[in-house]
Amino acid sequence: MDTTTAKQASTKFVVLGLLLGILMSAMDNTIVATAMGNIVADLGSFDKFAWVTASYMVAVMAGMPIYGKLSDMYGRKRFFLFGLIFFLIGSALCGIAQTMNQLIIFRAIQGIGGGALLPIAFTIIFDLFPPEKRGKMSGMFGAVFGLSSVLGPLLGAIITDSISWHWVFYINVPIGALSLFFIIRYYKESLEHRKQKIDWGGAITLVVSIVCLMFALELGGKTYDWNSIQIIGLFIVFAVFFIAFFIVERKAEEPIISFWMFKNRLFATAQILAFLYGGTFIILAVFIPIFVQAVYGSSATSAGFILTPMMIGSVIGSMIGGIFQTKASFRNLMLISVIAFFIGMLLLSNMTPDTARVWLTVFMMISGFGVGFNFSLLPAASMNDLEPRFRGTANSTNSFLRSFGMTLGVTIFGTVQTNVFTNKLNDAFSGMKGSAGSGAAQNIGDPQEIFQAGTRSQIPDAILNRIIDAMSSSITYVFLLALIPIVLAAVTILFMGKARVKTTAEMTKKAN
């Protein structure tokens, strides 16, 4: 095998290793959410279940900006491997957890590793490939990310139903081990890096502010009331340390986040879009399965399968966005994305309990197609105009804002859906005569419990139909509200300019 062929083979294995890492990290939170009912039933401590997600997301989000900067300073490989090893250790420990407290701690360990995988993987692709090949690769990586995000609920339901909840964590071990082998064996990177000063002040203030904000968002309205001293205190500490972070970063020699990047129009708009898209597309993965299970009366596994059309649309959109990066501007490609996303969400917002499932499939495919573009285009746009030594910071910022948008979107839209559902129930039963109606709304606990097959069959049709209408209306109302951030995204896209990915030949010609 000659040198060129050997290098190409090595690169393919590196790409495979990175794809496996993205598959695990992107799928993890949604696959675990599906299994939470079984986990609580086995380990108990229902009052602590919110901490299982919170501890993981806090660790992931706190680590993302730090890993991005460190990978710029000291190399991608070592920090990707560090994240991978921590993620695998955390996954194995989660699988053997005997108490809810243990699971919470082990999820935090898993999150410490998970924060490195996604941003560094995308950055390595930019380091490995010339501009004309990056689009295809970023399209592939974006497709895997989008696929993983919606594959999680389906896979989680299947594993939980057929094996046990422990395997939603154990499944990461063989996947991660393969990724570890491919990266160690085939990814070659210089081990020499110039000595640089780490911005400890920025790192500490940023981590503390993110930890407080994420805990407030994850636990508010669940473990603690929004107006409780705990949540208000977390928001206050977040504000103090976030202001301190800005002050420290202005004076730092090597800031964790270089704010001068936001003076670049393409970079700035890509970050805004990552936040808006993240906060909007996640509600599809969350509420569509609930709609199918609650309104149509499907099983949890069947509800997971309903996300398949969105997966297909997302993969197609991501690949198209990646392939055409050198042929069309980021703005024009993202306009196609946002138009499809808007149409799909608008159609979803008009669903009723009588909407045929075939139409739901079509609406989801349209939405998924629109969403898919952002997975490949926005990381590329973030790094497009920057030198290699800033790519890690740029992409980790993009990944952070997308994840933050997802967390905020679930929190805000989840609260809205719950409130609308409760109000609709009260309105529906206020007109019913007799005790069957007067206490029905108050006796309803977790809406998803009601729509389990065993429970559903015991509810009188007159009451069940009203509950279904309330659930349907509350979810479609959320889809209607989601049009607001999509419109804001459309306006933001108009400011992206005419930039596109330039090929190597074009850059050489310009340099000469």
Swiss-Prot record:
Subcellular location field: Cell membrane
Signals that turn on the gene: Expression is dependent on the growth phase and decreases in the late log phase.
TM annotation in the entry: 13-33, 48-68, 79-99, 109-129, 139-159, 163-183, 200-220, 228-248, 272-292, 304-324, 333-353, 358-378, 399-421, 475-495
Superkingdom of origin: Bacteria
Keyword Cell membrane belongs to the record: yes
CDD domains found in the cross-reference section: MFS_Azr1_MDR_like
Family statement: Belongs to the major facilitator superfamily. EmrB family.
Reported function: Confers resistance to puromycin, tosufloxacin and norfloxacin.
Protein name (Swiss-Prot/TrEMBL): Multidrug resistance protein 3
Organism: Bacillus subtilis (strain 168)
Gene: bmr3
